[in-house]
Amino acid sequence: TPQDIISDFSYICLLLTIKFEYMENISRRTAIKTFLAGGVALATTGIEAAAAAKKKTDVKEPLKGNVRHSVSKWCFGDYKLDEFCEICKHIGIESVELLDPVDWPIVQKHGLTVAMAQGAGLGIDRGFNDPALHDELVASYEKVIPMVADAGLTNLICFSGRRNGVTDLQGWENCEKGLKRLIPLAEKHKVVLTMELLNSVGHKDYLCDHTVWGAELCRRIGSPNFKLLYD
């Protein structure tokens, strides 16, 4: 459909903008204008168009800083983290997120931060909805929460886990019971436990899969140190 073509074209523009800005040091705005002007010909003449833009101007337009961007490393294949951080810093991204404690110093070495830390818990499918996992989850988060604070970070991801046949009400009660064991420690260290809302179409049977459910859990927890992360 025309919408699909536009979407695919925009995605190609984004990838090529990042690629050529880093490799050729041309401005993103110049690159985008050049690609859009090329229209359908981008598919065969994108490299030539970028080269032409390079000849026209080498002016680097500074970012205004109105939007703070963060990116997940796992989306970008086999880049070494050091190299990936260099690219992110070059194009104005401030954070590389969803990294374990061993990687936090590497990101910070490049003057970046970790907007959403990971390293505690048992993964997406095994979360606070299962009371049988609470002791293990609490022990894991009790270890990592102080590490987050010591690293100067704020947010630590957590998950509801799968629904496993329980009602919304039972899920709220299960998660509330487990998470409230951690809230005093999170408040002490000024760390925010952040539960990710995930679409249960892509993550089958995930419990915290819509805003109403997540917002009610926040109300039940009743602490500024528990919030939601939108996927």
Task: Pin down the residues of each PLM region.
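Alpha-helical elements of Rossmann-like donor-binding domains used by nucleotide-donor carbohydrate transfer enzymes
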Residues: T30, T34, E83, K143, ...
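N-terminal secretory signal peptides
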Residues: T1-I26
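N-terminal export signals
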Residues: E24, T30-A52
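Structural motif corresponding to the early beta-alpha repeats
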Residues: S70, C75, E94-I183, E187-V192
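Short linear capping/connector segments at secondary-structure termini
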Residues: A31, S160-N164, E196-S200
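C-terminal segment of N-terminal export signals and the immediately downstream linker at the start
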Residues: I18-E21, I47-Y79, E86-I87
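Acidic/histidine-rich catalytic cores of soluble enzymes
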Residues: C85-K89, R181-D231
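Residue-level signal for the nucleotide or nucleotide-sugar donor/cofactor binding architecture
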Residues: I26, E136, D209
